[in-house]
């Protein structure tokens, strides 16, 4: 079993906020994958279904962002799950709008919802971070996060959410690299490729070393005064 939790704040006042992109993502999965209607459990709205043969519980904690860990912790203990059985989807200020990154574990990066989940569930769960961009000035962060997506954002936002919903099986199976490529292609970015292994260059040699390495032994003279002198010193060759 896997829990996929999207983070956000409950109520219509916050529904269109950038901070609620996690809610939007699990809503998209619920619609696309034909999950059950939303119901209330674990201080959350929950929806159940199967993806690629795996039982999945979608969650939208209704505790407000800063207490998200309470809801997720209740569900984790009820189903006797480990942190590795949890995926959390949430907004990321430090990623450009429309970009996505996924990893297991790490710090909370100042995100209060993640800070709460770390405290209640441990840190070794998978984190799908969805970029909402940074306003550029620290004083504007609060208004940016709790502000609604602009009309200009709707194009990339729809593509991002659709890509997550369409490729939810990759999320469930842990095919993280493939998922990132699918999202990048769907949103007009370039697929991520493995960096080529750098070929180690041979250390530069001094001109003296190079000369020694390439120098060929000189042939001894077989005729003439020098040859006669060598024969007297060492005897004729072949004796």
Swiss-Prot record:
Record's GO cellular component terms: cytoplasm
Keywords per UniProt: Cytoplasm, Hydrolase, RNA-binding, tRNA-binding
One Pfam family hit: Pept_tRNA_hydro
Record-annotated site: Stabilizes the basic form of H active site to accept a proton: 91
Record: active site: 19 (proton acceptor)
InterPro entries: Pept_tRNA_hydro, Pept_tRNA_hydro_CS, Pept_tRNA_hydro_sf
Cell location: Cytoplasm
Annotated function: Hydrolyzes ribosome-free peptidyl-tRNAs (with 1 or more amino acids incorporated), which drop off the ribosome during protein synthesis, or as a result of ribosome stalling.
Protein name: Peptidyl-tRNA hydrolase
Organism encoding this protein: Rhizobium meliloti (strain 1021) (Ensifer meliloti)
């Amino acid at each position: 079993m896997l829990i996929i939790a999207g983070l956000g704040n409950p109520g219509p006042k916050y529904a269109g906020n950038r901070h609620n992109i996690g809610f939007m993502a699990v809503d998209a999965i619920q619609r696309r994958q034909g999950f059950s209607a939303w119901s209330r459990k674990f201080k959350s709205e929950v929806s159940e279904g199967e993806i690629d043969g795996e039982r999945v519980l979608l969650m939208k904690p209704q505790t407000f962002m800063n207490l998200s860990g309470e809801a997720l912790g209740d569900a984790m203990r009820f189903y006797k799950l480990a942190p590795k059985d949890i995926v959390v989807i949430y907004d990321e200020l430090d990623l450009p709008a429309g970009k996505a990154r996924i990893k297991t574990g790490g710090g909370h990066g100042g995100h209060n919802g993640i800070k709460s989940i770390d405290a209640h569930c441990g840190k070794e769960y998978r984190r799908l971070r969805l970029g909402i961009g940074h306003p550029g000035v620290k004083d504007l962060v609060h208004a940016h996060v709790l502000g609604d997506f602009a009309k200009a954002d709707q194009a990339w936002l729809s593509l991002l959410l659709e890509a997550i919903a369409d490729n939810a099986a990759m999320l469930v199976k842990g095919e993280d690299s493939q998922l990132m490529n699918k999202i990048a292609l769907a949103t007009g970015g370039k697929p991520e490729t493995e960096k080529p292994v750098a070929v180690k260059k041979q250390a530069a040699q001094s001109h003296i070393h190079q000369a020694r390495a390439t120098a060929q032994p000189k042939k001894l003279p077989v005729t003439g005064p020098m040859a006669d002198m060598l024969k007297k010193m060492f005897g004729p060759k072949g004796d």
